[in-house]
Amino acid sequence: MASGNLNSADNPLPCHYHRYPTRSAWAKRLLSIASLCLLIGFLASCGLITDGQASNTGSLKTVAQGSHGQFTYVAIGASDTFGIGTEDPYSENWPTDLAGMLGSNVHLINLGIPGMLVHEALSIELPIALDSHPDLVTIWLAVNDLVAKVPVDRYSHDLDLMLSRLQASDPHVPILVANVPDLTLLPYFKTYDPLVLQSRVQAYNAAIAGIVQQHHVILVDLTRQNYNIEAHPEYISGDGLHPTDLGYMQIAKVFYTTLQHAQEPAKKP
């Protein structure tokens, strides 16, 4: 990892990068999560939820299209998962777009919380994800850790722990983990040392790729090839950091395409 300051002296980099969502959006999201927790607790106490129900060994595409009942998709993340950058983060975010692509009977549980770090998500978001017995999990948690200067080895440890707990609960659930886009292309970072920032992005992405390979989960590549911010400035909102609704739609497409390719049977030589 490169040494030096990640940010310029005149523009200190905040530990948690985000604009706060509207009060109504927060209220809706928190009410939904609270209601979900109460429902899960009630069903578990009645013996209506068991570990066996979490298994998902069939085709993801078939299940999502509705042949096996409701399909639960859990999105773990931060402000980018929440939907910051749009007029209505509660409904305009990439997990909602992805859920729509997967099928009409998909039940989305969006756990994205602005400012979230992976270490914090282990105790805040992960327990809800586990109790939900998901059929699909996406994880996009890296940029907050990167800008907060969390050491790569500490970040790797926490991400590894998150995946281990998810797979211990259900070894068959598909899990997609996204990496870090090219932050040097974002207007928000224009005053920062691009070489240091790029080096840190590369270090994080190398760590993410290694952990994804170790756990045999699916890597979602959001680097320039798939999410070209430079060619599509309309993907970025007025804060110079978070995506617009168009940007979120493109991110959802990258997740969906990656998932579809991962589900395809391996070609015979």
Listing of model-derived features with the role each one plays in the protein:
Residues 100, 123-267:
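Alpha-helical cap/lid subdomain in secreted, periplasmic
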Residues 1-27:
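N-terminal secretory signal peptides that target proteins for export/translocation
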Residues 30-38:
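Sec-dependent signal peptide hydrophobic core
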Residues 79, 85-87, 114-117, 144, ...:
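Gly/Ser/Thr-rich beta-alpha loop segments that engage phosphate groups in nucleotides
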Residues 109-113, 117-122, 142:
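Subtilisin-like peptidase catalytic core
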Residues 48:
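Short, conserved catalytic or interaction motifs in soluble domains
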Residues 51-114, 126-131:
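Serine-esterase "nucleophile elbow" of acetyl-processing enzymes
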Residues 44-45:
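C-terminal motif of bacterial Sec signal peptides marking the signal peptidase cleavage site
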